[in-house]
Amino acid sequence: MSLEFLISKIQKNNFLLIGRAGVDIYPDPPGTKTENTNRYVTHLGGSSANMGVQLTKYGGSCSLLTRVSNDALGKFALNQLDYYGVKRDLVKLEDNESRISFAIVESTVEDHQSIIYRHKAADLFLNKSDIENSNLQDYECILITGTSLAAEPSRSSVLFALELAKEKNIPVIMDID
């Protein structure tokens, strides 16, 4: 696959992002340490969701393929995807005891902390049928993240998506995350 081919596919602005949507909270006001605040601001998180937001902001058409927890935080992420225009028809609610990824992120310059909770992360329950039902051929480019390879069944499902992408000559971009 040549660089020119990759660039031509990227320029078509039609992306499938495979990874996670999460929830990020920030101590408020900005610059406040977590242990010194009593107020937080909540935002959409997760590298794949965030890439989708930015690509959409600049004219891209993005679909996110992931799973989120079937609770208030998972539904918050879905609402945020809608707000930013990231297509979520491939996002499934996970009804087991999994949870959405959750991060507390400080905006301090010194002694910065990011605290990330990913116990039984919903996005890692992505499975082969999710990939089979995603119609990979409808996308010009696929973006994956390193964390989607961290545990089963997501790992083998994403590797299956890579095999299909190769067969269909769809370029894949990986964010180490």
Language-model features, listed with the residues they occupy:
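Conserved beta-alpha-beta core of the PfkB/ribokinase-like small-molecule kinase fold
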Residues: 141, 147-177
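Conserved N-terminal subdomain of the carbohydrate kinase-like
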Residues: 61-144
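General beta-strand structural signal in soluble alpha/beta enzymes
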Residues: 17-18, 90, 173-175
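Short, basic, glycine/proline-bearing loop/turn elements
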Residues: 37-38, 116-118, 145-147, 175-177
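Short amphipathic alpha-helices and their capping/turn segments at secondary-structure boundaries
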Residues: 2-14, 128-134, 157-167
